[in-house]
Amino acid sequence: MDQNLSDLDCLSDPDEKRWLDGKRKRKNSQCLLKNSMSGYIPSYLDKDEPCVVCSDKATGYHYRCITCEGCKGFFRRTIQKNLHPSYSCKYDACCIIDKITRNQCQLCRFKKCIAVGMAMDLVLDDSKRVAKRKLIEENRERRRKEEMLKSMQNRPEPTSEEWELIRLVTDAHCSTNAQGSHWKQKRKFLPDAIGQCPMTAVPENDRVDLEAFSEFTKIITPAITRVVDFAKKLPMFSELPCEDQIILLKGCCMEIMSLRAAVRYDPESETLTLSGEMAVKREQLKNGGLGVVSDAIFDLGKSLSAFNLDDTEVALLQAVLLMSSDRSGLTCMDKVEKCQETYLLAFEHYINHRKHHIPHFWPKLLMKVTDLRMIGACHASRFMHMKVECPTELFPPLFLEVFEDQEV
């Protein structure tokens, strides 16, 4: 009853209840005028061009006529489901169709669709519609690849000065990276008996396995020394004040060592090779003192394996990590920032030269810098835990010197 009252209220003037030819207008709950949803309108349409069927705002050419979305959908459903034989009209099939009355007589609306020229043969059945959608997706993917290839071709590559910088950074990395490309042949696996026993009665397995920790401390000093040697060989680093050099080295040391381990992740054995010589499993590294930091380094190794980084890209990543101007205590922040910008620009141009076929490769690679910075921050906190759990005599002096005073 309430519904009928609302229907009557929508036509306030009694004269408006009749067609121009004197026929009575029929009413339903949809007779209130609704604004069309604003959306994409093709450029070939004039502003507010009307639908040739109902005079609502048209959205484009549909089945050979300029129509609105509503009439397009009505015509498509009618043909696809073969509904028109069942349509009927109570008023001699001569209703006037507009945007207010279009839903009140399906037969007259369909007849008008045909009369204005909408083509039944252009309505696709289900199989053709699926094939068309597939073709559209294939074309869209093809265009995306073409645009990506075109944008890659138009990106700047390194200048002669940048090539020289890249060569020096790569040489610095290769000369300080233990075992080089022969690490798989040279590595030795840490025995399974070390560091893989579950730590019982300790919350979250937070106890440090001293045997595994002792094994790791044997390789930590040469690993740190190689990071220092790498930094000393870098252009611009030696020009910084000694105090800033020390701050930068302490800040990036764990990050660079983690990167060097991560790029030596082996999916077959599920190990990382530390310092180019010791292959360890996730639980061994975790129980040997690193805890959750172990998970972060292994996860990084897994994700980096898809990037197929070469020595130059690893070297430039290390240079970017080293020249981080937000390290606490720096006296020449601006100078360090300019150094990092120089390396970043050369790095980006080198990535353009390499033409990786991974979408958005450069920003994705930069996200790994963020991951490595997080690993460094987590390790600083983890180091405090190791100091509590492990006897002082197990800590090599250089290990203490680099990590003891880091901010947590």
Swiss-Prot record:
Q: Highest taxon of the source?
A: Eukaryota
Where are the annotated NR C4-type zinc-finger regions? 51-71, 89-113
Domain (NR LBD) ranges: 161-405
Report which residue ranges the record marks as coiled coil.
none
- Free-text tissue specificity from the UniProt record: A high level expression seen in the gills, intestine and muscles.
Which residues does UniProt assign to DNA binding? 48-125
Alphabetical list of Pfam families matching this protein: Hormone_recep, zf-C4
Amino-acid positions noted as binding Zn(2+) 1 in the UniProt annotation, renumbered to this chain:
C51, C54, C68, C71
Assigned protein family: Belongs to the nuclear hormone receptor family. NR1 subfamily.
- How is this protein named in the record? Thyroid hormone receptor alpha
From which organism does this entry originate?
A: Necturus maculosus (Mudpuppy)
